[in-house]
């Protein structure tokens, strides 16, 4: 049938003057970011200007047992990455960080996001002699930067020049022989923050990664900002700041980020509770208990309960060893994982009118299965409330929903969806309310709901064309 959307990637970097286990700290930080990608991961370490690394398919704990982590050795800088494939197939070659050697040195790069002009850039680079080894748009970014590096005095100048050419969503952590650099696209589609650890600096997709290694949160990287950590301290280039309206993906607050993270000044946990409160105002119902679908539906359920006065109940036990269904790359894998992911607590549900809170309905498969579990546990009624508007359009900025064909809301009305998933009523959060989730009240990308994107998007399935590379011309 239909299922849920998934996360993209998580990035991390650390700069230390020495005496710090940068590989071990990166390992710990990637554990904290594991929710952002579960297909592959990698760590690259810089030891006195020599960059080496390891990456593979699997979870952080699987790819880096103690002996593998020890082989990475010591160093002063490191970058790490957890990946879910949004552009480029699932393969070891597409795992990150990418390590690039060029005439002026070397570079390791980790990327969260998705380019909208990757196909055009790749074609131009290949015509100029570039040889690609992956089907990931991250390699396009890396080669664009190295191309600019040939005619600029520094790596940060090369990055700034590359930003004039690459379009779309990108939060980057780049490691050169002497510097660690954080980059956020001018729209700020994906989060990126700065932390302080002793006399060193760290960059991460979410603040929870800083907490996991004992680093102090300093601030978020501004949209369009380039932040450089080196022996001189921390400095930034703001040439591209303020060029575009801020457009953080609103799904970072709804689903992607961990609830204990703070993104652009707003706590994710609080934002999700606000979503639940708005839902209670927009879609009230007579019921006996409010239950959240683990994990991202739990905070919204608390908000709905507080606003409505309907008691909150724990209705599910989650198998913590099962990966998030939204992050499973294949539909068959999603369905299998749902079957063993959740179990109901029947004493909370039996004979009661249940308000079931979930973060989204994209394809519908996961939701339908969860509703079936609640029915089988003896619910008298099931009323679904969703802490996001209907998902009506593809995402071009880092989630794996590139076609309207797979979106249940595109081909069915809300009453029809309610019938398909088996609920007595169904209510979605309004687009107006979803833009008010964050306390900071800043701008969001809501293109997946409204069809209005902050930047020009490809008219065709550029992702598929990109992954085929030059084969169309052969």
PLM ranges: what are they?
Residues 1-223, 228-287, 293, 381:
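Conserved short alpha-helical segments that host acidic/polar catalytic motifs at enzyme active sites
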Residues 46-49, 177-179, 292-300, 307, ...:
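A glycine-rich phosphate-binding loop feature that marks nucleotide/adenosyl-phosphate handling sites
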Residues 290, 297-304, 308, 312, ...:
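Extended, hydrophobic alpha-helical segments in both membrane/secreted and soluble proteins
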Residues 309-354, 365, 392-402:
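Short, glycine/charge-rich flexible loops or terminal/linker lids adjacent to PRPP-binding catalytic cores
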């Amino acid at each position: 049938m239909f299922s849920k959307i998934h996360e993209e990637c998580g990035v991390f970097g650390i700069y230390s003057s020495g005496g710090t286990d940068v590989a071990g700290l990166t390992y710990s930080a990637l554990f904290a970011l594991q929710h952002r990608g579960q297909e592959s991961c990698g760590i690259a370490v810089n030891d006195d200007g020599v960059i080496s690394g390891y990456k593979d398919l699997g979870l952080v704990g699987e790819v880096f047992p103690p002996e593998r982590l020890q082989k990475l050795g010591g160093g002063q800088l490191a970058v790490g990455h957890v990946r879910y494939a949004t552009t480029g197939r699932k393969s070891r070659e597409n795992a990150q960080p990418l390590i690039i050697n060029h005439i002026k040195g070397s570079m390791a790069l980790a990327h969260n996001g998705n380019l909208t002009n990757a196909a055009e850039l790749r074609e131009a680079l290949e015509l100029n002699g570039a040889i690609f080894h992956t089907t990931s748009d991250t390699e396009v970014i890396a080669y664009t930067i190295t191309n600019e590096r040939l005619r600029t005095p520094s790596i940060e100048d090369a990055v700034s020049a590359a930003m004039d050419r690459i379009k779309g969503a990108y939060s980057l952590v780049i490691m050169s022989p002497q510097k660690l650099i954080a980059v956020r696209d001018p729209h700020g589609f994906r989060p990126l923050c700065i932390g302080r650890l002793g006399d060193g600096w760290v960059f991460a997709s979410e603040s929870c990664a800083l907490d996991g290694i004992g680093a102090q949160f300093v601030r978020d990287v501004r949209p369009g900002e380039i932040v450089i950590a080196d022996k001189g301290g921390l400095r930034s280039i703001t040439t591209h700041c303020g060029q575009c309206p801020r457009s953080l993906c609103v799904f970072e607050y709804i689903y992607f980020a961990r609830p204990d993270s703070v993104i652009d000044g707003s706590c994710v946990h609080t934002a999700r509770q606000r979503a639940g409160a708005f839902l209670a105002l927009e879609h009230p119902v007579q019921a006996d208990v409010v239950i959240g679908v683990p994990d991202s539906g739990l905070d919204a359920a608390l908000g709905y309960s507080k606003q409505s006065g309907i008691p909150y109940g724990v209705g599910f036990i989650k198998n913590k060893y099962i990966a998030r269904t939204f992050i499973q790359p294949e539909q068959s894998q999603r369905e299998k994982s749902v079957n063993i992911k959740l179990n109901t607590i029947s004493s909370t549900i039996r004979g009661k009118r249940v308000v079931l809170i979930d973060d989204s309905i994209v394809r519908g498969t996961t939701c339908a299965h969860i509703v079936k579990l609640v029915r089988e546990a003896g619910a008298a009624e099931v009323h679904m409330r969703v802490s996001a508007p209907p998902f009506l359009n593809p995402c071009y900025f880092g989630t794996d929903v590139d076609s309207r064909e797979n979106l249940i809301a595109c081909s069915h009305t809300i009453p029809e969806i309610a019938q398909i998933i088996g609920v007595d009523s169904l209510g979605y959060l309004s687009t107006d309310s979803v833009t008010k989730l964050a306390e900071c009240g800043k701008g969001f990308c809501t293109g997946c709901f409204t069809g209005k994107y902050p930047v020009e998007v490809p008219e065709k399935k550029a992702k598929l064309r990109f992954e085929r590379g030059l084969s169309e011309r052969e």
